[in-house]
Every structure is written in structure tokens, then in C-alpha cells.
């Protein structure tokens, strides 16, 4: 980002900018009072001030009122332009640096070319409604305990007749947990059988969950851990996260919706440019907490989703329960990091 002048920093500091616009606004109010007084004295039957003074008040009040309006308009336009200029810069490297500083990570790096394609997104995201970025940002995370996580972050614009809405999701890739071809999702996301999913023609419903399989496949809900489905993937408590699981016999993909503020390095309207790096640090703390919940679900996916039903009596509900709650996105200027809740053992 090019070095900003003191004048530009003034416009990008809400506290100073708001004081300036308030002063200009007060000048406009006094100008309006003077203009009203001048008009009333000039055309009214009882003159409060002489006609000459009334004309002066009309001229001065009108000019000051117009000037205050123009100054406020230009100031707001200039501020909007500067915010756009600042947000054109890619600060992914700074975000990566802040993420790598989190104590649970041994290494956090960006893939030049990762293993996840945007095409893997299920077709209940129709292209006529969702405009996803063509190349998702992909990352490799190594934890202090030796575990690794490969994931991608995808953003999209959801179009509708009333408004356009931003959405985002994380996609993790692991070795296949099953030798069958299936897709697990919420019952309100009907799958359109095209692309990766064209052979998934059969659907089975259990409560609020749908399982798509190939025709005549032996795979069904009985092969899945019910506690994992009920308490983790489709727990109604997790109001800020929707999960989907896709298994294609080679890899298993976990998809989780996340707040659009995930990986947000932009300067927000209510933030000061001088606090930008600090706010990115806070955002990285929040994102690390979200990623921690995501990672817990990925690890459970590897070991719990396809249960060992020969020893089902030894598996308790608490052993397959995790609170993977993704907390509400931050919207104020103080992006405070949020701690993820720990999994129950």
C-alpha cells in the first residue's frame, strides 16, 4: 500500500473525520437559521432586522449552507475513495504472518497450487445464483502436535432479485473414510445430480439429514455414527456453521460455512487506518478459533463418522461429541479474538 499523507490519514480516522463533519454540520444549521431569519425579515410584515441586513443574512446564510453541503459531500466521497484505495491492496501475507503466530500452529502457509478444486462444491450452489471465485485460496497448516490440515477458503456472491449477498465456506480434504461414493447434507439442500455428483441418484432421509448414494449401493445411515451426525455435523446449536461431507472413494471433503469476515483484511468503515494491522491481528485470532473448531470436526471425521459397529457397546456418546460452534462474526471496529470451545473426550 502506498504511503498515506497526513491529510489522507485524517480522512481514514473515523474519530477525527466525524468531528470534522459535525462541525461542518453545525455551521450548516446556523446558516439555515440565518437564512430563515433573513427571509422572514425581508418578506414578513414585521421586520426583525433592516432590509439591508436581511439581504445580507439571506446571502450569507445561503452561501454557507450550500458550502457546508458541498464540503460534507466531497469529504464523504473522498473518504469512500480512500477506503477503496486501501482495500485494493492484497494483505494475505500479513494475515498469514498473524495466523502463523498463533501458539497452536507450527506452520501456516499458502499453497501455490493446492489439491482442492472449486468444482468440488456441490451443485446445490447453482452457478446462476452463486458466483464463486474460480481459484480458491488454499492453505497447509501444521499443528504443534504433528497433525496437518489442508483446506481451502472460497467466497461467492449469492444473487437474488432483492439483493446480492456474500457467502463463504471452508473445504478440507483428507483420505477417503469409506470405499463408497456418497454425499451427506442437510435436508433443505437438495442435490442436483451433475458433475461430481451425477451418479448419486438415490437419497435417504433421517430426521433433518439427507444421504445421497449410488443406485443399488449398500451404503446407508447404518454405516454412519449417529452421535457424530446428531451432535457434530448437524447439531442445531451450531447456528453459524453448516456442514456437508462428500466422499468419492479417494478423498473425503468436509465443507463448512463460515462468516464472510473469515480472513477479512479489509479496512472497515468504522475502523481507523492506523489500527489496520492491529485489527488484522485480532481477525487472525478469531479465524484461528474458527479453524480450530473446523480442525476438530475434520479429526473426528477421520475416526468417528464410520463407526466400529462390531464394538458398538464400548463406544459412548460422549466419545463422539464435540462442540464445533462457530461464533457470531465480529462487526464492530474492535475485532476481538474468540476462543473455540474444547472437544469433549
Curated annotation (Swiss-Prot):
It is a multi-pass membrane protein. Residues 333-345 have a biased composition (Basic residues). Its main location: membrane. It is found in: Cell membrane. One of its GO terms (cellular component) is plasma membrane. Keywords: Cell membrane, Membrane, Transmembrane, Transmembrane helix. It comes from the Bacteria. It comes from Mycoplasma pneumoniae (strain ATCC 29342 / M129 / Subtype 1) (Mycoplasmoides pneumoniae). Residues 326-345 are annotated as: Disordered. This is Uncharacterized protein MG456 homolog. The chain crosses the membrane at residues 23-43, 56-76.
Amino acid at each position: 500500500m502506498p504511503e498515506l499523507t497526513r491529510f489522507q490519514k485524517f480522512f481514514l480516522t473515523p474519530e477525527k473525520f466525524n468531528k470534522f463533519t459535525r462541525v461542518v454540520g453545525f455551521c450548516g444549521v446556523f446558516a439555515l437559521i440565518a437564512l430563515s431569519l433573513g427571509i422572514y425579515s425581508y418578506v414578513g410584515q414585521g421586520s426583525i432586522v433592516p432590509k439591508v441586513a436581511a439581504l445580507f443574512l439571506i446571502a450569507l446564510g445561503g452561501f454557507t449552507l450550500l458550502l457546508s453541503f458541498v464540503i460534507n459531500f466531497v469529504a464523504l466521497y473522498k473518504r469512500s475513495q480512500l477506503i477503496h484505495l486501501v482495500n485494493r491492496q492484497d494483505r494475505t501475507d500479513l494475515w498469514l504472518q498473524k495466523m502463523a503466530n498463533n501458539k497452536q500452529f507450527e506452520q501456516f502457509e499458502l499453497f501455490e497450487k493446492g489439491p482442492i478444486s472449486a468444482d468440488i462444491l456441490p451443485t446445490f450452489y447453482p452457478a446462476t445464483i452463486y458466483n464463486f471465485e474460480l481459484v480458491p485460496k488454499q492453505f497447509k497448516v501444521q499443528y504443534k502436535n504433528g497433525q496437518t490440515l489442508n483446506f481451502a477458503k472460497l467466497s461467492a456472491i449469492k444473487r437474488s432479485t432483492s439483493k446480492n449477498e456474500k457467502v463463504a465456506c471452508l473445504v478440507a480434504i483428507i483420505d477417503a473414510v469409506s470405499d463408497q461414493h456418497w454425499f451427506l447434507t442437510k435436508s433443505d439442500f437438495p442435490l442436483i445430480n451433475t458433475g461430481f455428483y451425477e451418479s448419486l441418484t438415490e437419497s435417504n432421509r433421517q430426521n433433518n439429514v439427507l444421504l445421497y448414494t449410488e443406485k443399488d449401493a449398500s451404503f446407508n445411515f447404518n454405516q454412519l455414527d449417529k452421535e457424530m451426525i446428531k451432535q457434530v455435523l448437524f447439531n442445531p446449536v451450531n447456528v453459524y456453521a453448516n456442514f456437508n461431507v462428500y466422499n468419492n472413494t479417494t478423498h473425503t471433503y468436509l465443507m463448512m460455512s463460515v462468516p464472510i469476515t473469515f480472513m477479512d483484511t479489509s479496512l472497515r468503515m468504522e475502523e481507523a487506518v492506523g489500527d489496520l494491522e492491529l485489527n488484522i491481528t485480532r481477525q487472525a485470532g478469531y479465524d484461528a478459533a474458527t479453524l480450530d473448531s473446523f480442525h476438530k470436526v475434520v479429526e473426528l471425521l477421520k475416526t468417528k463418522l464410520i463407526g466400529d459397529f462390531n464394538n458398538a457397546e464400548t463406544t459412548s456418546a460422549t466419545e463422539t461429541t464435540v462442540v464445533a460452534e462457530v461464533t457470531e462474526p465480529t462487526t464492530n471496529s474492535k475485532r476481538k479474538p474468540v476462543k473455540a470451545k474444547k472437544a469433549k473426550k
